Amino acid sequence: MPPVRASVSIAALLSAASPLVAGAPPLGDPIIVTGRGLPPPRAAAAHDIATIDRARILQSASGRLEDVLRDVAGLQGFRRSDSRSANATSQSITLRGLGGNASSRALLILDGVPQADPFGGWISFPAIATDRIGRIRVTRGGGSALWGPGALGGTVEIESAAPGDLDPIDARLAIGSRNSRDARGSLMLMRRSSFITASGAFATGNGFIPIVAANRGPADHAAPYRQVSGAVRAVTALGPATELQANLSAFNDRRNRGIDHTDNRGHGVDGSLRLVGKGALRWSLLGYGQKRRFASQSAAINAGRSDSTLILDQYAVPSTGWGAHGDVVRLSGDLELRLGADLRAVRGETREFYQYVAGSATRRRVAGGRSLTTGAFADATLTEGALTASLSGRVDHWSIRDGRLFEQTLTGTTLTNTKFADRSGWQPTGRAAIAYRPGGGLNVLASAYRGWRLPTLNELYRPFRAGADATATNAALDPESLTGVEAGVDWALSANAKASFTVFTARLHNAIANVTVARGPGTFPGVGFVNAAGSYRRRENLNAIATSGAEFGFDLRPRPLDVHLSYSYVDARVRDDVAGHALNGLRPAQTPEHQVSATVGWTSPRDLRLSLTARESSSQYEDDLNQRMLKAAFTVDAFASIPVSRHLAIGLRGENLFDEQIEAGISTDGTVERAVPRTLWLEVTLK
């Protein structure tokens, strides 16, 4: 665009916005817009749901989404590390002990759009700044007819902040330990029945040394990070009961794992359009597109940890995802009927150099494919006095196509050129739920459900290495499915107090796991040579993972006090009789039995905000054979916001205040990697 035309365009935009800035009176009554989707279904009364409100989201000591989600015990990532030091591919989420795999078994959505990486299924947490979030709803348990494939353990629904959540201008700048800096800002512009928001976040730091002091060597150094994200959101009324919502966001993520040749790089762009009708006939129509690109390096380190060498350069992982979702809700007295359909298509591949000799790659690999799921669903909920009964179901057709694995030497000799057979099939999803309110604030609920998940392209086609260990691919993996039942009670003790208790049991059929087949040294199919410090693994479908447990929640909010307690117990066991697996009866990797999170907050009439959060996660196994155990982890975080004036506040934040050693991983030689140590922050907020 020529400079003159750009100046005219910007001037026109400013002119259009000037009535708002000047406070010009509206022409007629404005239509209220919220930017949100349809209200939760009536069936939610029979579901185990935890809600994290905006006030709590903004009081996270780290300011990171994965830390906020830890308020819900039982909702966990594959690793204890957060997105400042973890390998991005390990950042999945799951619920109720359905672990053992770094692909997400819970579905995370933002304004209706799935956020899992199209190729690998991991979550790019730095892409979602907490300042732009209005509310988080966590529904435990599978069988979501509305959201469909991927919601095995449950669903995490994130809503963007509404106009009532935001100030016209909000800027935050924080400095922290190890030269950490965190800057965030947002703008909101409202005009009659429309609003637009723009937000940005920047985080960087020198990082900490991931390897614990007792194991580290000269090759170990701090793990720096640099992350940027931005989002623009526009919402306007198209009529008295119809909203048009447009979202555009982007991120760039760079981090290092604490030794040379272990860089992670990722960036992406998401866009979506959603129409929401909130009249007598409620309806929603969403379309979205995602573009991602990821790169990662892996290194081998010598016995004395004095030197590292590059062994794999995953120089590009381009992927795209797109989809659509539509539903209509009809209310007829005590009956709510919801009908809809959706689809999601993903395509991606990994491009990498491997088998290094004297510091130079000798081979190249390209592996990937595409998949498509399409489904239709229905949900009927009847409310008759104190009783709510819900029956929902959906049918999905899935297909996996164009899978390939190509390997060649850099001199041009083809080593592998495999084109995998296309596959397709059908999968059902369903949930039957009931809730009864006998009085006295009690709500007794029970449900039975079935859900499923399609293997990611990463699981199907990409062999990988993690340190000395190597894992072979398996293009014949079947979809996972889950069946489960649960029962519980919600008790509104008073207007300011609520308690909940739920017991559950579930079985994950065809659970995908990285199964240890042999120990090095040796040369193995699909991965090549593995040294004596490593293990050879292969992705396989286990018979099942059986999980059962209990969850307890308590909220007390007699202003100015705010108390939140969440506890989860899970007994998860592998059920597998396949010869050579030797996993039957063992716990899935990275799956703790006990998790608890407790927060006490206080807000003064003059908006002084204080909170203290303690979390405990019991010991868990690093590996599928249950030979390496990560110790229990206990942390205490603190937050304080001190108002200086109407528009200025000073903040103090502390992560892991007692500087506990949080074990995040143990290699086969016993080397321990830790998660974030004590980190202190000083923050200035301008509104």
Enumerate the predicted regions with their spans.
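Extracytoplasmic beta-strand/coil segments of soluble accessory domains associated
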Residues: E66, R70-V113
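Short acidic/polar hinge/loop motifs at secondary-structure boundaries
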Residues: V113-R140
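Periplasmic-side early beta-strands and strand-to-turn transitions of outer-membrane beta-barrels
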Residues: S144-A145, E157-E159, G164-A174, R178, ...
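Flexible loop and strand-edge segments within Gram-negative outer membrane beta-barrel domains
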Residues: G205-I211, H221-Q227, A237-W283, G289-S319, ...
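Outer membrane beta-barrel strand-and-loop segments of large Gram-negative receptors
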Residues: A223, S319-V328, G369-F377, A472-D478, ...
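Conserved C-terminal beta-signal and adjacent last beta-strands/turns
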Residues: T236, A380-T381, A435, A446, ...
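Surface-exposed extracellular loop regions of Gram-negative outer-membrane beta-barrel proteins
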Residues: K291-A295, R347-Y356, H397-T413, D422, ...
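Gram-negative outer-membrane beta-barrel transporters
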Residues: L382-A389, K498-L508, F529-D624, F658
